[in-house]
Amino acid sequence: MSVTMRQMLEAGVHFGHQTRFWNPKMAPYIFGQRNKIHIVNLEHTLVMLREALDYARRLTANKGTILFVGTKRQARDIVMEEAIRCGAPYVNQRWLGGMLTNFKTIRQSIKRLQDMEKMVQDGTLNKLTKKEALDFQRELEKLNNSLGGIKEMKGLPDAMFVIDVGYQKGAIVEADKLGIPVVGVVDTNHSPAGVRYVVPGNDDSSQAIRLYARAMADAILEGRNQSVQEIIEMSKSDDEIMSGRDQSAGA
């Protein structure tokens, strides 16, 4: 998906926050104000979003993993849907402290979740008492809510895509500590500090959030497809080389 200026206008990407809540570090990306609301300069946003998507394409073409993060109410369902569509890990409920910096411990909880899911599939759950089964279901639901989106993630992600960097401050701090690049949607009331690829824009409108997340998911799918195509081309090239050798040997 190639994002256009018109699409951004229709999604309300240009609407920032009230001027009294602004963060001066976002000044370079602000076009002006209307009715005491800052207006984001979409010419900057378009260029910066495309740079972020190019980065995502290159990363996933090289088999990199991008973690989607968006736990605010407006973003939860959208983040989950788009991450699932492109096969990316995601966090759309509460960000658990240490999710990145203490991934070894988190991995143990993921293993517990996977073991519990196996118990459901193999019928072990049927052997539990009513109280045990109820406790089991509660724990399973809790683990699924917090870790379900990252249960297939084998290690730390190569990058992180974040909706609303202010709301996800803990995630940004952890990524920064570990040197994990962040692609982040930054509204006029937040600081772009710690964000490698800043996408200035509205982080409250569900239409705007859908536009960012869909564009990122498309870029990931394009990158993966590019990787597959390169493997196919390399395979064809190898076959041609081998075929040429066989013909030479037979001559």
Curated annotation (Swiss-Prot):
Biological-process GO terms, alphabetical: translation
Pfam families with a match to the protein in the record: Ribosomal_S2
Top-level lineage group: Bacteria
Family: Belongs to the universal ribosomal protein uS2 family.
Keyword Ribosomal protein: yes
Protein name per its UniProtKB record: Small ribosomal subunit protein uS2
Any GO MF annotation of the entry: structural constituent of ribosome
Gene Ontology cellular component list: cytosolic small ribosomal subunit
Organism for this UniProt entry: Nitrosomonas europaea (strain ATCC 19718 / CIP 103999 / KCTC 2705 / NBRC 14298)
Ribonucleoprotein found in the keyword field: yes
Keywords: Ribonucleoprotein, Ribosomal protein
Entries under InterPro entries matching the protein: Ribosomal_uS2 (IPR001865), Ribosomal_uS2_bac/mit/plastid (IPR005706), Ribosomal_uS2_CS (IPR018130), Ribosomal_uS2_flav_dom_sf (IPR023591)
